[in-house]
Design a protein with these regions (language model features):
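N-terminal beta1-alpha1 ligand-phosphate binding loop
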Residues: 11-42
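Cysteine-cluster motifs in flexible loop/terminal segments that predominantly coordinate metals
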Residues: 52-80
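Short, Lys/Arg-enriched N-terminal segments with co-localized hydrophobic residues
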Residues: 1-10
């Protein structure tokens, strides 16, 4: 299917590595995707969630009210700042006990809520 695509030299895909291992299997899978995108002129960047604690969303709504991101100053705000520049997203995660990594799940909950219109309507995919 990807062979039928035309070149898109002005597109950018922001990929999220949800593994606690910076250059583990999830990174390797995302690098393969990046290589395929590059063949079609699509720029990509891999954003590593990291192996530090990412607290879950508490639903306070402060990020939506202020527009300044989550009050928890961590990698979620860094991602949301980059999210507006991306045309699409790919989320990668190892599978831990039949689910995505806990860090990625908390990350996505907060990123989607605080990212608001920066992410709305843009295509996304998952690599597991």
């Amino acid at each position: 299917m990807i062979d039928s695509l035309e070149r898109k030299d002005d597109m950018k895909v922001l990929m999220v590595n949800g593994s606690p291992h910076r250059e583990g299997c999830t990174y390797t899978a995302l690098k393969e995707v990046a290589g395929a995108l590059e063949k079609y002129g699509i720029e990509s960047e891999i954003f590593w969630v990291g192996n530090g604690e990412i607290a879950g969303c508490i639903g306070c709504g402060a990020c939506a009210k202020t527009g300044e991101g989550c009050f928890r100053k961590d990698v979620v705000n860094e991602f949301v700042a980059k999210a507006g520049e991306a045309d699409g997203y790919i989320f990668g995660s190892p599978v831990h006990y039949a689910a995505a990594s806990g860090a990625l799940t908390s990350f996505m909950d907060r990123a989607f809520y605080s990212g608001g219109s920066k992410m709305t309507g843009k295509p996304a995919a998952a690599v597991v």
